[in-house]
């Protein structure tokens, strides 16, 4: 029998578990997969299968991440879980697993701990838009007042980092009980409550094709008699022949018109997100466009040089630097398709950054780049990746 085609009838959402070590992230991940697979089909996963997360590479950085899938009544979810704290930091900063929402797991017995705080801060910095809380190990707390206290603490912590703490869904339960097949309030019922919260609280993400048109420039050719062709992969949106576009970054922004879209040597009337295309530009000279710029819908994205970012610096073992760096360190910042030199300003309380650290920095680039909050970049020295980062806030 032929393999069934994957029918994506339900909208797709990416989520992941975050929170302090040993608060039950992996147990909860296993419990969700197990309970939901019995209700809506899919694969149950054992704790050990998730905990033995395979290595993968993102932007030259090795990260251990477990990917599982499950379905609810309304949606299909891809869920990431990481074994170690360092893996979370790397994952969130590189955007290896872009999350539409996160499930913050917090032990009711311990309350918020240092990594609870750190993961909420990271989620804020890297632009995770929604957090839902699973208050775990509630079977170990008999005192209702204590539970209330922990819930208040978590809400305060979320509000402190600009998440809507008062309106955040908090589900009380026990991942362990649910995984063991307990049908009670803290077991299976709690997992179903969590599934409902995921469905109702995290909005369906915009598909790439519905975004405003953006294509990073990879190469530029001039074709005699036809003009200038720019090639690249469309990141989001749709480009139609005859539409006005802007060329943004590196130099002053220019306006032009798309007079043709080519794919696999065929002429099309439009290109869309995910397509590798050549775009023919009217009246644009070859030397007006270069790798590192973007083509975009006019007015949709601006060039910037000054921003704050959250970065992870590779350890020596990962092929990174062997020595720390200090204020005013000047590496290259690799955005989309090109390197731009920039200088790094460290936070007041930070004298230096060691390989393996993550830190908030302020960057000034020597040339402007088409930039939005949430844009990922690599930090390089002579073509070698020494770090990864994400734009947290644009200054100018």
From Swiss-Prot:
Q: Which GO terms describe its cellular component?
A: cytoplasm
The segment annotated G5 runs over 174-176
Which parts of this chain are annotated as the region G2?
Answer: 60-64
Q: Specify which residues bind Mg(2+) according to the UniProt entry for this protein.
A: 26
Please give the InterPro entries that the UniProt record associates with this protein: EF-Tu_GTP-bd (IPR041709), EF-Tu_GTPase (IPR050055), EFTu-like_2 (IPR004161), EFTU_2 (IPR033720), G_TR_CS (IPR031157), P-loop_NTPase (IPR027417), Small_GTP-bd (IPR005225), T_Tr_GTP-bd_dom (IPR000795)
Q: Which residues form the tr-type G domain?
A: 10-206
Span list, region G4: 136-139
Superkingdom is Bacteria
Give the subcellular location. Answer: Cytoplasm
Instruction: Show the catalytic activity.
Output: GTP + H2O = GDP + phosphate + H(+)
Q: Where is this region: G1?
A: 19-26
**Keyword line:** Cytoplasm, Elongation factor, GTP-binding, Hydrolase, Magnesium, Metal-binding, Nucleotide-binding, Protein biosynthesis
Q: Where does GTP bind?
A: 19-26, 81-85, 136-139
Region of interest (G3), ranges = 81-84
Q: What NCBIfam families does the database record attribute to this sequence?
A: EF-Tu (TIGR00485), PRK00049.1 (NF000766), PRK12735.1 (NF009372), PRK12736.1 (NF009373), small_GTP (TIGR00231)
User: Which protein family is named in the record?
Assistant: Belongs to the TRAFAC class translation factor GTPase superfamily. Classic translation factor GTPase family. EF-Tu/EF-1A subfamily.
Please give the function described in this protein's UniProt entry: GTP hydrolase that promotes the GTP-dependent binding of aminoacyl-tRNA to the A-site of ribosomes during protein biosynthesis.
HAMAP family (UniProt xref): EF_Tu_B (MF_00118_B)
Self-association or partners: how does it assemble?
Monomer.
Protein's UniProt name? Elongation factor Tu
